[in-house]
Amino acid sequence: MSSNQELVVLGKLGSSHGIKGWLKITSYTDSVEGIFDYSPWLIKEQGVWREVKVAQWRFQGKAVVAELEGVATREHAQMLTNCEIAIMPEQMKDLDDSEFYHRDLIGCEVTNINGYNMGIVDQIVETGSNDVLLIKANAKDAFGKAERMIPFVPEQFIKQVDLQGKQILVDWDPDF
């Protein structure tokens, strides 16, 4: 199948639930049930990625559980515990021009409107009100910063995003 780097990880399989092979699901999608909008899933079982399809799923209290095709026993389900759930990138939904997947922003070079290179996006932190770019500063940062946190607020702080060129233009003081 595909290498791990090409895949988009959407969640992971949790512990078994019941005796018929159901599994708890940890979803990294915006809504917990959003993970079920994608099919087939890829899971890494014994070092090999393979396709699986969800036969059915449901909410179980605050958790989400699913039955996977071909997994009919508790023992088989237990062997899948902690396996990542991934999809191929082409399965991702198309976004509007003003929307971005976090994975596409990671690795972008961030420059402020005065031309100062702020560093590289290392991760995105979800705060509830807006996402925040965690920027790993250059080793020889003139302001002695190791990292910066810039709110991802289009127009106010984020002036331009060029995914092809892996560039983000921001209105942000490098000393802040």
From Swiss-Prot:
Major location category of this protein: cytoplasm
Keyword hit for rRNA processing: yes
MF term (GO), any: ribosome binding
GO biological process annotation, one example: ribosomal small subunit biogenesis
Coiled-coil ranges (or none): none
Domain PRC barrel: 97-176
Domain of life: Bacteria
One Pfam assignment: RimM
Any one Gene Ontology cellular component term annotated for this protein: ribosome
Keywords from the UniProt entry: Chaperone, Cytoplasm, Ribosome biogenesis, rRNA processing
Ribosomal protein found in the keyword field: no
Subcellular localization, as worded in the UniProt entry: Cytoplasm
Function: An accessory protein needed during the final step in the assembly of 30S ribosomal subunit, possibly for assembly of the head region. Essential for efficient processing of 16S rRNA. May be needed both before and after RbfA during the maturation of 16S rRNA. It has affinity for free ribosomal 30S subunits but not for 70S ribosomes.
Record note on quaternary structure: Binds ribosomal protein uS19.
Domain note: The PRC barrel domain binds ribosomal protein uS19.
Family indicated by similarity: Belongs to the RimM family.
Alphabetized PANTHER family for the sequence: RIBOSOME MATURATION FACTOR RIMM
HAMAP family tied to this protein: Ribosome_mat_RimM (MF_00014)
Protein's UniProt name: Ribosome maturation factor RimM
Organism whose genome encodes this protein: Shewanella frigidimarina (strain NCIMB 400)
Gene name in the database record: rimM
